[in-house]
Amino acid sequence: MTGIYIHVPFCAKKCPYCAFFSEQYGRKTVDNYVKAVIRNLQLYQVNDTVDTIYFGGGTPSLLTAGQISDILEACSKYLHLYQPEITFEFNPTGKRNTYLHDIHSAGVNRLSIGTQSFSDSQLKLLGRTHSVNDGIRTVETAFQVGFNNISCDLMLALPEQSELILHETLETLVKLPITHVSAYLLQIEEGTPFSQNQDLLARCLDDDQSADRYLQTVHFLEDAGIHQYEVSSFAKKGFESRHNLKYWKCVDYLGIGAGAHSCYMGKRFYVPEDVSQFCDGEHQTEIILSENPYDREERIMLGLRTVEGVPAEWVKSQKIPLFQKAGYLRIGENGNISLTAEGFAVSNAVISAMI
């Protein structure tokens, strides 16, 4: 089973913490971009069965519901679909009821809402244009129009994010009709406005405080029946992201759009971050990153991001006993090595030391 990722690299406003590729929204450019996406879906001639489609960005909700419908009609026409999970990233501002109803009718069956926080002061700090009330109303409206698989994004370890502020955000979150949470630690990326804001940098949490907020989130969600299955991913039973699991389990996925990455037919490649080139070309350009995309180190690195872990025989590191003693690793009855919640809190350091 193959997954399809459709990248929509347009934003109405760039968030000050974001280092991802995006361009300013323009109607004519977006119209041409959608046509290029459909053209590439036809040209790739994917022979394998496709069971997940993911619209990511950028801000996919800048596309009209009609454009989403056109893309999904092309997917149905040119791909071999089988009971697909179709995820759509949605920004909780502006259009809600009619738009959500229309994309649900078009076939979108999973919504990923960029709430980020349920604290107005923290949303303001992040430069977000929506309020707490906007986030709540978006989730509730999505549920009312028929979405029964709803994920919310949370950002952790924000400047001045106290235990109380995070607790209130988590309390608000779990009262909503959601099935999934993606929770990410704030990363200060070079070249972003955040990286140049000395006042903000002085208010950032240290590593220990960041780990505390992460573990607070893990334990709170677990108590609410939203279980961790990957370092940043939590779900009610049966609602794990089928698309994202492909990344961590080394299953083929094909990215369509400027800046999209793929691991497909034995190659890892990406499309240049150039909207004009993507729109003007008959077929999207592929830049090869690797022709051995799932080597041993890659499988270990990705597998250790999951609660399931990897077979112990894959890992030859002499640091296993040290990390076990520190409470970062465990070896299960099935013989798999996996990270504990405490290990996930420092996963980058632990995983890099293991491969």
Which sequence ranges carry the predicted segments?
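Short, amphipathic alpha-helical interaction segments positioned at domain boundaries
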Residues: 342-355
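Immediate flanking context of iron-sulfur cluster ligation sites
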Residues: 1-8
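Short amphipathic alpha-helical interaction segments
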Residues: 314-326
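Local cysteine-cluster metal-coordination motifs and their immediate loop/turn environment
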Residues: 9-20
